[in-house]
Amino acid sequence: MAERPRDRLGRPLPIDTAPEDAAPPVIDVTGLDDNAVWAVALDYLDRGMPFHAHEVFEQRWRSASGPEKDAWRALAQWGAALTHAERGNDEGARRLAERALETLESASAVPTCVDAPRVRASCDGLSADPD
């Protein structure tokens, strides 16, 4: 059964949506190394598809073992925060960004390919008081 089409922010579209009107499916990153997973997720972010980046990070988090697992979880939370922000859910974005920061800070290891300062700055911006 084919996966339901989605928009660039991961929202489901009608089943009969033309392929050119839907976002491409999220690629399977099984078997890719950390550098490639990070690069795929950043490409999605650069193309305005934070939901896809979240899904890539979540794939890695769920399959990871060892000291970097929590860092991948933090990245999945960051991707979700960015998705909520793009959807206009500022409160959800704030909460997820705060959770991502906490998870990243408590991670026992962060993959060397991850630009942790970029992630922290982004999360800080999302969790800042809008007033």
Model-derived segments and spans:
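N-terminal alpha-helical interaction modules that lie
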Residues: 1-64, 103-131
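TPR/TPR-like (Sel1-like) alpha-helical repeat modules
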Residues: 88-108
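Short secondary-structure subsegments characteristic of cysteine-rich extracellular domains
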Residues: 77-78, 85-89
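Hydrophobic/aromatic-rich, well-ordered segments within soluble, folded domains that form packed cores
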Residues: 49, 79-80
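Residue signature of alpha-solenoid helical repeat architecture, marking inter-repeat boundaries
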Residues: 31, 69-71
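Residue-level signature for tetratricopeptide repeat
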Residues: 43-44, 76, 83
